[in-house]
Amino acid sequence: MTRGSDRPRLYVRFAESDPAAAEQRLAQMSAHKAHLRNEDGVPEGFRILASGPMQAESGGSAAALIIAEARCIEDVMAFSDADPFVIHGVYNRIRILSWTPTLSRISGLQGD
């Protein structure tokens, strides 16, 4: 996908939590949530469709998932890089991938 494409695509950010960063998670939680909800200053065509933590069997947060619509992966990467959880090392691994749903029962997401 090239920068500036007219047609938004879907992207998934999968961020694995660093168990040693529990204090930073707590300290940055409000700023992280504000970042996810803030629509000011995001690139045109960028919007979060769904987000939330993924729980480990032990009950702690193991990872977090964001499904976003954007015109290019660079916009998703820039949004992710500005996330307080990313800035303060709450995640130890982040993957951002283009996603093409082939089956969806989520309202508004259509499969190819």
PLM regions: where:
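Conserved, structured core segments of small domains
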Residues: 1-112
